């Protein structure tokens, strides 16, 4: 599998989605009030570190600073993992209400990444559409210098995720079947599958418990 093939398929997919977006927006705009999508399945476009089904509105940009702390076993010596923190700086943008893109840079292994997220179904107030369904594509490139030469293509990775979410009163549930591809040489198994899950429970107007 080669990076050029994935890039071609990805660009073709964006083109097809963009052409159909105006018609989709017209249909969504013509629905009744009870058919409108529900709001705030999750509090943000991210749950903890992974993507939620929330989207940035059309024409809106968002600069994000994300932290992932280390382990707490060293206690006060490294301030319970604070000294080991990894930081990602990123920018997200809403092309339409149903298409969102972004890019960023992570201090861990000096990784640069891009992503695109597409919304196909939105859970409605009257539950005529019972779930929210989205597709996420992300690609990353590691730029950390090693003592040995690493082939350029082996620095890339891609992930494909289907995001399926359901909001029931104060409880939100999401599952994320995933396919990850590392560009190792052809003798290695470079395709991995998995499934993730997330829960959000609203305990107050501005307080929620998130698990991922």
Sequence positions of predicted segments:
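Short linear sequence elements within intrinsically disordered, low-complexity coil regions
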Residues: 11-13, 47
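Transmembrane beta-barrel domains of Gram-negative outer membranes and organellar outer membranes
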Residues: 21-148, 155-160, 166-173, 180-181, ...
């Amino acid at each position: 599998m080669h990076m050029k093939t994935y890039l071609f398929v990805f660009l073709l997919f964006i083109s097809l989605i963009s052409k159909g977006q105006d018609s989709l927006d017209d249909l969504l705009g013509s629905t009744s009030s009870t058919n409108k999508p529900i709001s705030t399945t999750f509090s943000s476009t991210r749950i903890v570190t992974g993507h939620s089904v929330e989207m940035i509105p059309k024409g809106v940009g968002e600069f994000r600073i994300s932290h992932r702390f280390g382990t707490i076993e060293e206690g006060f010596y490294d301030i319970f993992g604070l000294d080991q923190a990894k930081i990602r700086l990123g920018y997200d943008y809403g092309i339409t209400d149903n298409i969102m893109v972004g890019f960023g840079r992570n201090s861990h292994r000096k990784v640069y990444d891009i992503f695109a997220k597409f919304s196909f179904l939105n859970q409605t107030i009257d539950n005529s559409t019972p779930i929210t369904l989205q597709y996420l594509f992300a690609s990353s490139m590691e730029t950390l210098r090693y003592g040995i030469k690493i082939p350029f293509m082996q620095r890339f990775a891609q992930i494909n995720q289907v995001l399926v979410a359901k909001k029931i009163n104060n409880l939100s549930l999401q599952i994320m079947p995933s396919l990850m591809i590392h560009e190792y040489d052809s003798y290695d198994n470079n395709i991995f599958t998995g499934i993730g899950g997330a829960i959000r429970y609203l305990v107050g107007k501005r307080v929620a418990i998130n698990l991922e």
